[in-house]
A protein has these predicted regions:
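Interface amphipathic segments
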Residues: 1-222
């Protein structure tokens, strides 16, 4: 079901889709609502399974500017992966046309965390952005998305992104504890990464080491 109508200066829309309780991954009911006015867009998405459990309930405000766009998330207590999280009230992520990112976003639930935080410049390093992900259960994430394969494992990431004069850099660690893909165990993955891209990312320097179950499996330098 889909509907679009006008209320004052706003264009309002709603989209609903349902399926039987035999649907892939148990997806049963998905509702998308929102409105558009000028350069502002509001989107709300809610998903339930066959047992009427809410797997996802979250909204996004999007503002389009001449040389950037800004997104913020609501409410302060969204549901993600069947759990009720807390989002900082002043959350905001702005992406500029040169891909500079200004962010203040922190989503937390028990020992789980998704954080994007802009940091002050440090020497030649400017536009610093800390990306921190802790304790994310991939199984719950893939259960609410029909587009992802069946995965399980606990994701953690600690990355620093920055600009050093005309070089884009990234350094840190990405790991998954006890990763399973389509019910087949792949192991515990641990990737240490350093990357530098110059000349609009056409010139690359990469240094990474991949370990699986604490055994070094791949090393790339160059």
């Amino acid at each position: 079901q889909m509907g679009i109508w006008q209320t004052g200066k706003s264009l309002v829309y709603a989209l609903g889709a349902g399926s039987s309780d035999q649907a892939w991954k148990g997806l049963f009911n998905i509702n998308l609502t929102g409105k558009m006015q000028g350069n502002q867009f509001r989107i709300e998405l809610k998903q339930k399974d066959a047992r009427q459990r809410v797997g996802f309930d979250m909204g996004i405000n999007l503002v389009m500017l001449d040389s950037a766009f800004t997104v913020s998330f609501f409410p302060m207590t969204p549901i993600l992966g069947y759990s009720r999280w807390i989002v900082n009230a002043d959350n905001k992520v702005t992406v500029y046309k040169d891909w500079k990112i200004d962010a203040n976003l922190r989503m937390a639930y028990q020992n789980k965390l998704v954080s994007l935080q802009s940091l002050p410049d440090e020497g030649e390093r400017t536009d610093r952005l800390q990306v921190e992900i802790t304790g994310i259960d991939l199984k719950k994430l893939t259960e609410i998305s029909p587009f992802l394969p069946d995965l399980s494992g606990i994701l953690h990431t600690d990355l620093l992104l920055y600009t050093d004069r005309k070089t884009f850099g990234a350094e840190g660690n990405i790991g998954v504890n006890n990763l399973f893909y389509e019910e087949q165990r792949m192991g515990t993955l641990d990737l240490d990464l350093q990357y530098a891209g110059k000349d609009h990312l056409t010139d690359h320097a990469v240094d990474f080491e991949l370990k699986i179950d604490s055994i070094r499996r791949a090393v790339v330098q160059g």
